[in-house]
A protein has these predicted regions:
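N-terminal secretory signal peptides and thylakoid transit peptides that target proteins
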Residues: 2-20
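An N-terminal hydrophobic leader/cap segment in hydrolases
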Residues: 60-107
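Catalytic cores of eukaryotic secretory-pathway lumenal/extracellular enzymes that build
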Residues: 89-93, 98-224
């Protein structure tokens, strides 16, 4: 696997610009939340087998609509494709394998603004690595980022320079994966961006860069 990594000069520019952006993100309320509830708890995924069995049963019991009347996808996802996906999810997909991959990584939960936030935190072996927070999109989860962790934290193993290394923080957005579900409105991109700043400072990163796609990228546009 190869990864295109920024040059050291580009990393300096990214670090400088992101540090300025991060400092503008921290309101008084966010600082108070960080001071009053900053515990970081280890986390492991352990989905009960009964829940997996029930999910497979419900997938297998899907009541399918009539087949589309065209040979393309102009009427939506073709019935045959959805039926094949459902068959795979119900019979072939190995959740435990995915669970093991997640549990092989350092996972944590911390409370920010009253909401539990799940995240993966992988530090590079290179102490001068650049901290980066990476956010998944919609629909999506932290699983999207699993393949980039090793190339970005250990670039020398992929033919790049150790100076291109990153410390990675990969959170689950509120309401996604193993993060808590908001009970009220207000967790918009700007709020999530402020929460990510609190998270990074809680982990000891006063300066950092950020990356995301789709909805995950919109959080970082909030600083203009």
């Amino acid at each position: 696997m190869s990864a295109k990594l920024p040059s050291p000069d580009r990393r300096k520019i990214l670090a400088a610009s992101a540090a300025v952006a991060a400092s503008r993100f921290i309101p008084t309320q966010a600082r108070a939340a960080s001071a009053s509830s900053d515990a970081i708890r280890s986390f492991k995924v352990d989905v009960p087998e009964a829940e997996l069995t029930d999910l497979r049963r419900r997938i297998s019991a899907t009541r399918w609509p009539e087949q589309e009347t065209v040979a393309d996808d102009s009427q939506g996802v073709p019935l045959a494709m959805m039926q094949e996906l459902a068959r795979y999810w119900a019979t072939d997909y190995d959740w435990r394998k995915c669970e093991a991959k997640l549990n092989a990584l350092p996972q944590f939960i911390t409370e920010i603004d009253g909401l539990d936030i799940h995240f993966i935190h992988v530090r590079s072996k290179h102490e001068n690595a650049l901290p980066m927070i990476v956010t998944h999109g919609w629909p999506g989860s932290v699983i999207e980022q699993l393949k980039i962790i090793d190339p970005l934290t250990n670039p020398a193993a992929y033919g790049a320079s150790a100076s291109d290394a990153f410390h990675l923080v990969i959170p689950s957005m509120p309401g996604y994966g193993f993060s808590g579900k908001p009970t009220a409105t207000g967790w918009n991109p700007a709020h999530i961006a402020r929460a990510w700043v609190v998270l990074m400072k809680r982990l000891g990163y006063s300066q950092f860069v950020f990356a995301g796609r789709g909805l995950g990228r919109s959080h970082y546009k909030c600083d203009g």
